[in-house]
């Protein structure tokens, strides 16, 4: 299948790119996996997407974006891209289905996944007191006690952000010192609402089934192997994200964490005609609205590129 614009990945970035590309009469094809919509499909309440005064649901918002992209003329294909060749034109992408897609330009919006602890109890309470995004969900924990797992910049920033809402924040770290930058560490130590629990890991999340909510944690001290219970109302996992870029390893420039590198103030990668939008290239903001904005930029830049 040949197209002027091939969009790999859905979510706010992919769908917005599709809307703009379709309205520019570029007849885009968007290839998405089994469960399209990206990370927003795993969150429940969304309160920070512009244009909605009432709380909306993440999956609903993604369905709306998908329907909008379809309505303006995007062709959606369910397939999993397993290999690409960006070294010659037209660009090539091969799906697990065996289908071959060729394109004059490509927008990559494959996103990222939060790293999880991989506990059964974590899966159970994800979206019901367990989250990987303080910016998204901190607001729901006004005057409550929450815990954050991690020891890097992200964990420290999440912990400090959560003190705006929570009455107490416990930062759980498996080592005896943090990896975060010194400046951040100082701010953290100065914050009276934050308590650090060193040398510890979360073994289990404890809570109720009906309605689903988190009540506490079982934590283990890795030095003496003692377990203890901790009463909390919410848990935030901040141990990093993994961008979905393995596919592009020898084709596109990435940073040491695997995020695609784009030119300043642009979504263009080091290969002209290949653009990247959303969490696949953004490790700073990671919001639906910024991803959508980048999707728009990528489509406009692709249009300009195709016009020569």
Per-segment meaning from a language model:
Residues 2-4, 78, 142-144, 199, ...:
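Phosphate-coordination loops involved in phosphoryl transfer and adenosine-cofactor binding
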Residues 3-72, 156-182, 255:
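Beta1-alpha1 glycine-rich phosphate/pyrophosphate-binding loop at the start
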Residues 4, 27, 129, 144-145:
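Residues that mark the start of a beta-strand
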Residues 69-95, 100-103, 164-264, 304-308:
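A Rossmann-like FAD-binding core segment of flavoenzymes
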Residues 76-96, 100-139:
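Glycine/small-residue-rich loop that forms an oxyanion/phosphate-binding "nest" at active or ligand-binding sites
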């Amino acid at each position: 299948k040949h197209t002027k614009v091939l969009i790999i990945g859905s979510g706010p970035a992919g769908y917005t790119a599709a809307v703009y590309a379709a309205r520019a009469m570029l007849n885009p094809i968007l290839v998405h996996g089994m469960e399209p919509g990206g990370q927003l499909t795993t969150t429940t309440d969304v309160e920070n997407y512009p244009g909605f005064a009432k709380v909306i649901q993440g999956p609903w918002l993604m369905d709306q974006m998908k329907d909008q992209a379809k309505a303006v003329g995007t062709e959606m294909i369910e397939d999993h891209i397993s290999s690409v060749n960006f070294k010659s034109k037209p660009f090539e992408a091969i799906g697990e289905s065996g289908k071959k897609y060729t394109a004059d330009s490509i927008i990559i919006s494959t996103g990222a996944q939060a790293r999880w602890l991989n506990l059964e109890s974590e899966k159970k309470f994800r979206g019901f007191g367990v989250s990987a995004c303080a910016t998204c969900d901190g607001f729901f924990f006004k005057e409550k006690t929450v815990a954050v797992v991690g020891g890097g910049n992200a964990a420290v920033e999440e912990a400090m952000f959560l003190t705006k809402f929570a009455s107490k924040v416990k930062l759980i770290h498996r080592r005896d010192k943090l990896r975060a930058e010194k400046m951040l560490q100082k701010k953290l130590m100065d914050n009276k609402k934050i308590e650090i629990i060193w040398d510890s890991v979360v073994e289990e999340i404890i809570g109720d089934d009906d309605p689903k909510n988190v009540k506490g944690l079982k934590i283990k001290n890795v030095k003496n192997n003692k377990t203890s219970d901790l009463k909390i109302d919410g848990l935030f996992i901040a141990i990093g994200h993994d961008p979905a870029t393995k596919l592009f390893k020898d084709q596109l420039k990435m940073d040491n964490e695997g995020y695609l590198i784009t030119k300043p103030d642009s979504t263009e990668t080091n290969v002209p005609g290949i653009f990247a939008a959303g969490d696949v290239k953004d490790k700073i903001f990671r919001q639906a609205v910024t991803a959508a904005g980048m999707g728009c930029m990528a489509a406009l830049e692709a249009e300009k590129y195709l016009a020569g």
